[in-house]
Amino acid sequence: MELTMKKVSVIAAAVAATLAAGSAFAVDFNGYFRAGTGISGNGNADQAVNKAGTGRLGNENDNYYEFGFAEELKTGEQTWKVESMIAQGNSGANGWEDGDFNVAQFNVQAKGLLASDQEAVMWAGKRYYQRKDIHITDFYFLNTSGTGGGIENLSVGNQKLSVALVQDGDNTNSSGYIFDARLANIGLWENASLELAMAYNFATEKDSKNEVADDGVLVSAILHQGLSNGFNQTVFQYGTAGYGAQAANFWGAGSYYARGTEAFNDASGFRLLNWGVINLGENWEMGHQLAYLAGSDIGGQFGGDGANKNTYTGKSFDIDQYSVVVRPMYKWNDTMRTVFEAGYNAGEKISNGGLATEDFGNAKFTVAQAWAMGDSFWARPELRVYGTYLLDTENDKAFGDDDTEFVVGIQVEAWW
């Protein structure tokens, strides 16, 4: 009995210590999710077409969740941040759906370790690493996230330098890595700054193995202009080899480098992006995306699920495309708004199992009645009821027996 009481006392003391620590260091609960459903005219439930090029409003047919927990622990002049996040996505077709939970983040970031630069941060673990995206299209144009480590926000004059090494895949022949270097806060004219980034993707070959894919480099220049009524950002990116193929498409840029194929060894590509959000009077706000993407000597790959999947066809192509997306929003009051979004994406893509190219064209028009916790363009949570009209300008059979489709749906989006 005495031994049992001692065990209970130890447990009680541990619980008390945990509660005391919680009162001193509050855990930060953060995250993002979207969920919704729609009914389409062809009877195939919800529909979504090329949201990176035509806009995401009323054009997402999935549920996606991110739940993160972080805590900052202070000791003297140092701050240690422990960060974690799980993520999961599914179609939302049933009330209970199986799916793997991904540990999207699990890392430690320590600030104040360098006496000469108290703002510099050393980190290691799995992390969303300084991702760059355009919200209205859900397009991450620079994303080298993964497991690794580095140091960021090193002071170089008035600029901030960050360097990192992140693993990027593993196959039977090699292991891939990204060396990421960035210089931010380069002052230009009034309210304007420049950030330069370089990602070098390389591989280490395993014993007696040969990696056929060449290493690639992606360079980015991001010009941010603050405005009295919002902001504008212009991005130029240039990539070689596997990064050349990424830059010529809306595939993201940074991770998931193509290894195990020589299809992109001679490739080069670039992107020119412009996006931003501005106020247009007391009741109107608008976001936009303008994009032009092009690539040279992009190799074709066999499709399907056979033994030749992703194998180089021996044919290479020059491709390009452009995208225009606008999202104006009218605010009726502090909660209710009507949101419009129109987008068009067209160009030339590799098709026919990597043996030819073809023209493509997608258009989307959405009207949504929405209610949000605040009147800002960025206010969330937001409930939406929407109608979306989809058009494929090059394929008469894109939606069953038609080149058009109409979707009515409801969605919630939140971040905190």
UniProtKB/Swiss-Prot annotation:
Gene Ontology biological-process entries: monoatomic ion transport
Highest taxon in the source lineage: Bacteria
Matches recorded under SUPFAM superfamilies: Porins (SSF56935)
Catalytic activity: beta-maltose(in) = beta-maltose(out)
Source organism (scientific name): Vibrio cholerae serotype O1 (strain ATCC 39541 / Classical Ogawa 395 / O395)
The protein's assembly and partners: Homotrimer formed of three 18-stranded antiparallel beta-barrels, containing three independent channels.
InterPro entries: G_neg_Bact_CarbUptk_Porin (IPR050286), Maltoporin (IPR023738), Porin_LamB (IPR003192), Porin_LamB_sf (IPR036998)
Induction comment: By maltose.
An example Gene Ontology molecular-function term: maltodextrin transmembrane transporter activity
Protein name: Maltoporin
Site feature Greasy slide, important in sugar transport, where: Y32, Y64, W96, F231, W378, W415
Compartments, record wording: Cell outer membrane
Annotated HAMAP family: LamB
Protein family according to the UniProt entry: Belongs to the porin LamB (TC 1.B.3) family.
Function: Involved in the transport of maltose and maltodextrins.
Lineage: Bacteria, Pseudomonadati, Pseudomonadota, Gammaproteobacteria, Vibrionales
